Amino acid sequence: MLKKLILPFFLIFTTISAQETDISYYVQKATESYQNKDYAESAKNFRRSLELAPQSQAIKYNLACAYSLSGNNNEALKLLNELVDAGGGLDAEQDPDFTSLKDTPGFNSIREKIKKLKAPVVNSTKAFVINEKDLIPEGIAYDTKTGSFFLSSLYKSKILQVSPDGSFKNFTSERQDGLWAVVGMKADPEWGFLYAASSFTNTMKGSDPKDEGRAGVFKFDISSGRLVKKYTTPAEKHFFNDLVYTKQGDIYVTDSQSPAVYFISKDTDSLKLYLDLAGFQYPNGIALSDDGKYLFVAHSAGILKVDLKKKTYTSVIADNNVSLEFCDGLYFYKNSLIGIQNSNFNRIARFYLDNSLSRVTKMEVLEANNPEFIIPTTGTIKGDEFYFIATSQLRAFDSNGKILPEEKLKDVLILKLKL
């Protein structure tokens, strides 16, 4: 069974355009061939996709499926071994696409590896609980000045403020100031602002189709909760996902639907395209190096290092047994990147970088397969601790995009890890 390449549930009703030079173009062609049971042609197009995104676990998995179904068992086993050695491919045991492999010694060896990978790694403790089950949070931010945390709501299009004692209140009301689904956030204590990325989704409460494709960055005064300014896009194809700010007060935000990074300069106070990332699928998490020279942008197949002065980018390099793909949240900490990988993995990983910040020298799994997890999404660093959303419940909607009944939902759990 093909592994979806991979959009959050709240974007499954939208389409992302694909061109012949894009990974998504070949994935689409491969998927069509798979559905038509032309598995050799499917393998051909997945191979082309993998050439464009050699670290993509999802593409490797799909190619292994196509190989198995077209009778190329040796290549299928080779790819599955690469996947599990990098911590992926956990669905292979139950996947009917690998029926032809399941009695082979090679597949039995893979089963043993998967069993070990599925073991929980739990180093976290409970930070606080929000008993608002239908919040469906995606972003979390911490303000060092007030000691408050902020949680964004995808479903209710609002922001919660959590006091140091764990009590919480609405920082904004639902749809206040024209908010759509609220996604990534950052609190800037120097300027006293909370920046929130907000985008239309079909699953947000009271969604209006006329807003489809709209997105923006909303800047709030932390002390008063007042909207200072919002920077919005026209109704095209945008999904602002996560953002980061510099010491100078500039803001960079990822656009996941029309792959790009946008920029709000403190000097011009306006939203502009900074970097076109056509050819990369679903830019998401974003982080800034401590010296302010480099951005790190996560996408579906890895992480880009962006030189802010030169406005150029390169892919962060990792060995084959280290996967950098699908980091929902991404954070720079002491010459390393912390990524929450919730698509092909169920983990929080720390990627240690070399002095040039270009290559991963070591990976450490901080947390994985925690029984409490219901799609962990993003986090925030407080001192030497990492706080993160453990129960986002991003898929708590039916096939029509309607939220599930409250009795099927869980309280929002925030966990913390010592770094």
Where are these regions (language model features)?
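Short, conserved, GDST-rich strand-edge loop motifs in beta-rich repeat architectures
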Residues: 197-213, 391-409
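Beta-rich, blade/repeat-based domains predominating
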Residues: 132-146, 154, 176-191, 197-202, ...
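Short loop/turn segments that connect beta-strands within beta-propeller blades
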Residues: 162-167, 221-226, 265-269, 307-311, ...
